């Protein structure tokens, strides 16, 4: 349904945001 689609999108977005944060941290080190 629509709700599970929203949850999936949120999970993907969170994953992408987490990866971006890790990349930033790696650059700072």
Swiss-Prot record:
Source species taxonomy: Eukaryota, Metazoa, Chordata, Craniata, Vertebrata
As for family, the record states: Belongs to the frog skin active peptide (FSAP) family. Dermaseptin subfamily.
Query: Keywords, A to Z?
Result: Amidation, Amphibian defense peptide, Antimicrobial, Secreted
Tissue/organ expression: Expressed by the skin glands.
GO CC term (a single one):
extracellular region
Its annotated function is as follows: Has antimicrobial activity.
Modification type Valine amide: residues: 29
Gene Ontology biological process:
defense response
State the name under which the record lists this protein.
Dermaseptin-1.2TR
Q: Name one Pfam family in it.
A: DD_K
User: Which subcellular locations apply to this protein?
Assistant: Secreted
């Amino acid at each position: 349904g629509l709700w599970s689609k929203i949850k999936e999108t949120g999970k993907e977005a969170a994953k992408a945001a987490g990866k971006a944060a890790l990349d930033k941290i790696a650059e700072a080190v």
